[in-house]
Swiss-Prot record:
Monomer. Tetrapolymerization of the monopyrrole PBG into the hydroxymethylbilane pre-uroporphyrinogen in several discrete steps. The modification S-(dipyrrolylmethanemethyl)cysteine is found at C249. Keywords: Porphyrin biosynthesis, Transferase. One of its GO terms (cellular component) is cytoplasm. HAMAP family: Porphobil_deam. This is Porphobilinogen deaminase. It comes from the Bacteria. The lineage of its organism: Bacteria, Pseudomonadati, Pseudomonadota, Alphaproteobacteria, Rhodobacterales. Pathway: Porphyrin-containing compound metabolism; protoporphyrin-IX biosynthesis; coproporphyrinogen-III from 5-aminolevulinate: step 2/4.
Length: 313
Protein backbone atom coordinates (compact mmCIF):
# COMPACT_ATOMS: atom_id res chain seq x y z
CA UNK A 1 0.00 0.00 0.00
CA UNK A 2 1.30 3.44 -0.98
CA UNK A 3 2.31 5.60 1.98
CA UNK A 4 0.35 8.85 1.74
CA UNK A 5 2.03 12.22 2.24
CA UNK A 6 1.11 14.24 5.33
CA UNK A 7 2.09 17.60 6.89
CA UNK A 8 5.19 16.03 8.47
CA UNK A 9 6.21 14.31 5.24
CA UNK A 10 4.70 16.38 2.42
CA UNK A 11 5.12 15.99 -1.32
CA UNK A 12 7.43 18.84 -2.31
CA UNK A 13 6.40 20.29 -5.67
CA UNK A 14 9.15 22.12 -7.55
CA UNK A 15 8.18 24.93 -9.90
CA UNK A 16 9.31 28.18 -11.43
CA UNK A 17 8.01 31.29 -9.71
CA UNK A 18 5.96 32.99 -12.42
CA UNK A 19 2.22 33.34 -11.97
CA UNK A 20 1.63 30.79 -14.73
CA UNK A 21 4.11 28.27 -13.31
CA UNK A 22 2.53 28.59 -9.87
CA UNK A 23 -0.95 28.11 -11.36
CA UNK A 24 0.28 24.89 -12.98
CA UNK A 25 1.83 23.69 -9.71
CA UNK A 26 -1.40 24.40 -7.84
CA UNK A 27 -3.44 22.58 -10.49
CA UNK A 28 -1.19 19.54 -10.05
CA UNK A 29 -1.52 19.73 -6.27
CA UNK A 30 -5.31 20.12 -6.47
CA UNK A 31 -5.64 17.09 -8.76
CA UNK A 32 -3.53 15.00 -6.38
CA UNK A 33 -5.60 16.19 -3.42
CA UNK A 34 -8.84 15.21 -5.18
CA UNK A 35 -7.54 11.86 -6.40
CA UNK A 36 -6.23 10.76 -3.01
CA UNK A 37 -8.43 12.63 -0.53
CA UNK A 38 -5.52 14.67 0.79
CA UNK A 39 -5.42 18.10 2.42
CA UNK A 40 -3.38 21.01 1.08
CA UNK A 41 -0.90 20.73 3.95
CA UNK A 42 0.21 17.34 2.61
CA UNK A 43 1.99 19.30 -0.13
CA UNK A 44 4.58 22.06 -0.23
CA UNK A 45 5.23 24.31 -3.22
CA UNK A 46 8.97 24.96 -3.67
CA UNK A 47 9.83 27.87 -5.99
CA UNK A 48 13.10 27.51 -7.90
CA UNK A 49 14.56 30.29 -10.04
CA UNK A 50 15.97 29.11 -13.36
CA UNK A 51 18.50 30.68 -15.71
CA UNK A 52 15.68 31.49 -18.13
CA UNK A 53 13.94 33.48 -15.39
CA UNK A 54 17.07 35.42 -14.48
CA UNK A 55 18.39 36.35 -17.93
CA UNK A 56 15.70 38.42 -19.64
CA UNK A 57 17.75 40.81 -21.77
CA UNK A 58 18.92 38.30 -24.39
CA UNK A 59 17.12 36.00 -26.85
CA UNK A 60 16.74 32.38 -25.71
CA UNK A 61 18.84 31.12 -28.62
CA UNK A 62 21.82 33.11 -27.28
CA UNK A 63 21.69 31.65 -23.78
CA UNK A 64 21.03 27.99 -24.38
CA UNK A 65 17.51 27.00 -25.43
CA UNK A 66 14.90 24.91 -23.64
CA UNK A 67 16.97 23.63 -20.70
CA UNK A 68 17.15 27.19 -19.39
CA UNK A 69 13.72 26.77 -17.79
CA UNK A 70 14.28 23.31 -16.31
CA UNK A 71 17.89 22.62 -15.38
CA UNK A 72 17.88 24.01 -11.84
CA UNK A 73 14.56 22.33 -11.09
CA UNK A 74 15.81 18.97 -12.32
CA UNK A 75 18.99 19.39 -10.27
CA UNK A 76 16.81 19.89 -7.17
CA UNK A 77 14.82 16.75 -8.04
CA UNK A 78 17.97 14.66 -8.39
CA UNK A 79 19.28 16.09 -5.10
CA UNK A 80 16.04 15.01 -3.31
CA UNK A 81 15.25 18.64 -2.47
CA UNK A 82 11.86 18.22 -4.16
CA UNK A 83 9.74 15.15 -4.97
CA UNK A 84 8.12 16.18 -8.24
CA UNK A 85 8.66 18.95 -10.77
CA UNK A 86 5.83 20.57 -12.71
CA UNK A 87 6.68 21.69 -16.22
CA UNK A 88 5.15 23.28 -19.28
CA UNK A 89 5.95 20.46 -21.70
CA UNK A 90 6.66 22.85 -24.56
CA UNK A 91 9.66 24.10 -22.54
CA UNK A 92 11.09 20.62 -21.95
CA UNK A 93 14.17 19.26 -23.75
CA UNK A 94 13.47 15.93 -25.44
CA UNK A 95 16.32 14.27 -23.53
CA UNK A 96 15.99 14.08 -19.75
CA UNK A 97 18.76 13.72 -17.18
CA UNK A 98 19.57 10.15 -16.21
CA UNK A 99 17.43 9.09 -13.24
CA UNK A 100 14.42 11.27 -14.08
CA UNK A 101 11.22 10.41 -15.93
CA UNK A 102 8.02 12.12 -17.07
CA UNK A 103 5.11 9.69 -17.32
CA UNK A 104 2.33 11.87 -15.90
CA UNK A 105 0.53 14.38 -18.12
CA UNK A 106 -2.44 16.45 -16.99
CA UNK A 107 -5.46 16.88 -19.29
CA UNK A 108 -4.32 19.16 -22.10
CA UNK A 109 -5.59 22.71 -22.35
CA UNK A 110 -6.33 24.70 -25.53
CA UNK A 111 -3.33 24.20 -27.84
CA UNK A 112 -3.86 27.35 -29.89
CA UNK A 113 -1.93 30.61 -29.91
CA UNK A 114 -3.74 33.74 -28.75
CA UNK A 115 -3.57 36.96 -30.76
CA UNK A 116 -3.21 39.88 -28.36
CA UNK A 117 -3.60 43.52 -29.38
CA UNK A 118 -5.38 46.59 -28.06
CA UNK A 119 -5.83 48.01 -31.56
CA UNK A 120 -6.41 45.10 -33.93
CA UNK A 121 -8.65 42.03 -33.82
CA UNK A 122 -6.64 39.62 -35.98
CA UNK A 123 -3.37 39.13 -37.84
CA UNK A 124 -5.14 40.05 -41.09
CA UNK A 125 -6.00 43.49 -39.70
CA UNK A 126 -2.39 44.45 -38.92
CA UNK A 127 -1.30 47.32 -41.18
CA UNK A 128 1.73 47.16 -43.45
CA UNK A 129 4.95 47.36 -41.41
CA UNK A 130 3.25 46.94 -38.02
CA UNK A 131 5.54 46.03 -35.11
CA UNK A 132 4.81 42.64 -33.52
CA UNK A 133 6.60 41.35 -30.42
CA UNK A 134 7.53 37.71 -29.83
CA UNK A 135 10.44 35.75 -28.36
CA UNK A 136 9.29 32.50 -30.02
CA UNK A 137 11.32 31.59 -33.10
CA UNK A 138 8.41 29.44 -34.26
CA UNK A 139 5.87 32.27 -34.07
CA UNK A 140 8.29 34.75 -35.63
CA UNK A 141 9.05 32.41 -38.54
CA UNK A 142 5.38 31.57 -39.10
CA UNK A 143 4.43 35.23 -39.04
CA UNK A 144 7.28 36.18 -41.37
CA UNK A 145 6.16 33.47 -43.80
CA UNK A 146 2.63 34.82 -43.83
CA UNK A 147 3.29 38.54 -43.44
CA UNK A 148 6.87 39.40 -44.48
CA UNK A 149 5.99 43.10 -44.30
CA UNK A 150 5.67 43.05 -40.50
CA UNK A 151 8.49 44.18 -38.23
CA UNK A 152 9.27 41.55 -35.56
CA UNK A 153 10.89 42.54 -32.26
CA UNK A 154 12.15 40.45 -29.32
CA UNK A 155 9.60 40.11 -26.49
CA UNK A 156 11.04 38.18 -23.53
CA UNK A 157 9.38 37.87 -20.12
CA UNK A 158 6.33 36.37 -18.45
CA UNK A 159 2.74 37.07 -19.49
CA UNK A 160 2.44 40.22 -17.38
CA UNK A 161 5.77 41.59 -18.64
CA UNK A 162 4.78 41.09 -22.26
CA UNK A 163 1.40 42.74 -21.74
CA UNK A 164 3.14 45.73 -20.13
CA UNK A 165 5.43 46.03 -23.18
CA UNK A 166 2.33 46.09 -25.36
CA UNK A 167 0.79 48.77 -23.15
CA UNK A 168 4.00 50.81 -23.37
CA UNK A 169 3.85 50.78 -27.16
CA UNK A 170 6.90 48.58 -27.80
CA UNK A 171 4.69 46.68 -30.26
CA UNK A 172 1.06 46.78 -31.42
CA UNK A 173 0.49 43.03 -31.09
CA UNK A 174 1.93 39.86 -29.61
CA UNK A 175 1.08 36.19 -29.21
CA UNK A 176 0.58 34.17 -26.05
CA UNK A 177 -0.63 30.62 -25.45
CA UNK A 178 -4.39 30.25 -24.99
CA UNK A 179 -3.60 27.59 -22.37
CA UNK A 180 -1.58 30.00 -20.26
CA UNK A 181 -4.24 32.69 -20.40
CA UNK A 182 -6.89 30.13 -19.42
CA UNK A 183 -4.88 28.93 -16.42
CA UNK A 184 -4.29 32.52 -15.31
CA UNK A 185 -7.97 33.44 -15.67
CA UNK A 186 -6.98 36.02 -18.30
CA UNK A 187 -8.77 34.83 -21.43
CA UNK A 188 -10.21 38.32 -21.84
CA UNK A 189 -6.74 39.48 -22.91
CA UNK A 190 -6.94 37.50 -26.16
CA UNK A 191 -8.58 39.19 -29.14
CA UNK A 192 -8.99 35.72 -30.58
CA UNK A 193 -7.44 32.29 -30.94
CA UNK A 194 -5.30 31.50 -33.97
CA UNK A 195 -6.46 28.21 -35.47
CA UNK A 196 -3.83 25.47 -36.03
CA UNK A 197 -4.47 25.59 -39.79
CA UNK A 198 -3.27 29.19 -39.68
CA UNK A 199 -0.43 28.84 -37.16
CA UNK A 200 0.51 25.33 -36.08
CA UNK A 201 1.33 25.41 -32.34
CA UNK A 202 4.54 24.46 -30.59
CA UNK A 203 5.08 20.80 -29.79
CA UNK A 204 3.29 19.91 -26.51
CA UNK A 205 1.78 23.41 -26.16
CA UNK A 206 -0.93 23.47 -23.49
CA UNK A 207 0.28 20.33 -21.72
CA UNK A 208 1.57 20.11 -18.14
CA UNK A 209 3.98 17.27 -17.41
CA UNK A 210 5.02 16.08 -13.96
CA UNK A 211 8.58 14.82 -13.57
CA UNK A 212 9.81 12.45 -10.86
CA UNK A 213 12.79 10.33 -9.96
CA UNK A 214 12.71 7.06 -11.89
CA UNK A 215 13.25 4.98 -8.74
CA UNK A 216 10.55 6.71 -6.67
CA UNK A 217 7.79 4.08 -6.66
CA UNK A 218 5.60 5.91 -4.12
CA UNK A 219 5.44 9.07 -6.18
CA UNK A 220 4.87 7.06 -9.36
CA UNK A 221 1.83 5.45 -7.75
CA UNK A 222 0.43 8.81 -6.62
CA UNK A 223 0.90 10.40 -10.04
CA UNK A 224 -0.63 7.49 -11.97
CA UNK A 225 -4.04 8.49 -10.60
CA UNK A 226 -3.97 11.90 -12.29
CA UNK A 227 -2.27 11.14 -15.61
CA UNK A 228 -4.40 11.67 -18.71
CA UNK A 229 -4.09 8.95 -21.37
CA UNK A 230 -5.09 11.13 -24.33
CA UNK A 231 -2.57 13.83 -23.40
CA UNK A 232 0.14 11.19 -23.06
CA UNK A 233 -0.59 9.71 -26.50
CA UNK A 234 -0.58 13.10 -28.20
CA UNK A 235 2.49 14.50 -26.49
CA UNK A 236 4.46 11.27 -27.00
CA UNK A 237 3.92 11.52 -30.77
CA UNK A 238 4.76 15.23 -30.89
CA UNK A 239 7.92 14.89 -28.81
CA UNK A 240 9.15 11.93 -30.88
CA UNK A 241 8.80 14.21 -33.92
CA UNK A 242 10.69 16.98 -32.13
CA UNK A 243 13.41 14.64 -30.86
CA UNK A 244 14.23 13.33 -34.33
CA UNK A 245 14.58 16.92 -35.52
CA UNK A 246 16.77 17.73 -32.50
CA UNK A 247 14.38 20.54 -31.66
CA UNK A 248 15.19 23.31 -29.20
CA UNK A 249 14.35 26.98 -28.73
CA UNK A 250 16.87 27.60 -31.53
CA UNK A 251 14.74 25.73 -34.05
CA UNK A 252 11.46 26.90 -35.65
CA UNK A 253 9.44 23.68 -35.41
CA UNK A 254 5.70 23.20 -34.97
CA UNK A 255 3.75 20.02 -34.35
CA UNK A 256 0.29 18.91 -33.29
CA UNK A 257 -1.22 15.48 -32.69
CA UNK A 258 -5.00 15.11 -32.50
CA UNK A 259 -6.96 12.01 -31.54
CA UNK A 260 -9.85 10.83 -33.68
CA UNK A 261 -11.13 7.77 -31.82
CA UNK A 262 -8.27 5.27 -31.78
CA UNK A 263 -6.55 7.08 -34.67
CA UNK A 264 -3.99 9.85 -34.40
CA UNK A 265 -3.46 12.69 -36.85
CA UNK A 266 0.00 14.23 -36.53
CA UNK A 267 0.94 17.43 -38.35
CA UNK A 268 4.41 18.91 -38.38
CA UNK A 269 6.34 21.72 -40.01
CA UNK A 270 9.83 23.15 -40.05
CA UNK A 271 10.67 26.69 -41.07
CA UNK A 272 13.64 28.86 -41.84
CA UNK A 273 13.85 31.56 -39.14
CA UNK A 274 13.12 34.30 -41.69
CA UNK A 275 10.00 32.49 -42.91
CA UNK A 276 11.38 32.17 -46.44
CA UNK A 277 10.76 28.42 -46.55
CA UNK A 278 8.19 26.21 -44.83
CA UNK A 279 8.17 22.41 -45.14
CA UNK A 280 5.11 20.60 -43.79
CA UNK A 281 3.53 17.14 -43.81
CA UNK A 282 1.26 14.93 -41.75
CA UNK A 283 0.63 11.32 -40.75
CA UNK A 284 -2.50 9.44 -39.72
CA UNK A 285 -2.33 6.08 -37.99
CA UNK A 286 -3.11 4.04 -34.87
CA UNK A 287 -2.79 6.15 -31.71
CA UNK A 288 -0.56 3.49 -30.17
CA UNK A 289 1.99 4.05 -32.96
CA UNK A 290 2.35 7.77 -32.23
CA UNK A 291 6.06 7.71 -31.41
CA UNK A 292 6.92 5.84 -34.61
CA UNK A 293 4.71 8.22 -36.60
CA UNK A 294 6.51 11.18 -35.08
CA UNK A 295 9.92 9.82 -36.01
CA UNK A 296 8.76 8.94 -39.53
CA UNK A 297 7.24 12.38 -40.08
CA UNK A 298 10.45 14.05 -38.95
CA UNK A 299 12.46 11.86 -41.32
CA UNK A 300 10.28 12.96 -44.23
CA UNK A 301 10.74 16.65 -43.42
CA UNK A 302 14.49 16.20 -43.00
CA UNK A 303 14.61 14.41 -46.35
CA UNK A 304 12.75 17.23 -48.09
CA UNK A 305 14.85 20.00 -46.52
CA UNK A 306 17.83 21.46 -48.41
CA UNK A 307 21.27 20.56 -47.04
CA UNK A 308 21.68 23.94 -45.35
CA UNK A 309 18.17 24.07 -43.87
CA UNK A 310 19.25 23.26 -40.31
CA UNK A 311 22.38 25.42 -40.38
CA UNK A 312 20.78 28.15 -38.29
CA UNK A 313 22.95 30.43 -36.22
Amino acid sequence: MTQMPDPQNPIRIGTRGSALALAQAHETRDRLMAAHGLAADAFRIVVIKTTGDRVLDRPLKEIGGKGLFTREIEDALLAHEIDIAVHSMKDMPTIQPEGLVIDCYLPREDVRDAFVSAQFAAISELPQGAVVGSSSLRRRAQLAARRPDLKLVEFRGNVQTRLKKLEDGVAVATFLAMAGLTRLGMLHVARGAVEPDEMLPAVAQGCIGVERRADDARTASLLAAISDRDSALRVTAERAFLARLDGSCQTPIAGLAELQGDRLRLRGEILRPDGSEVIAAERVGPAADGAAMGTDLAEELRGRAPADFFDWS
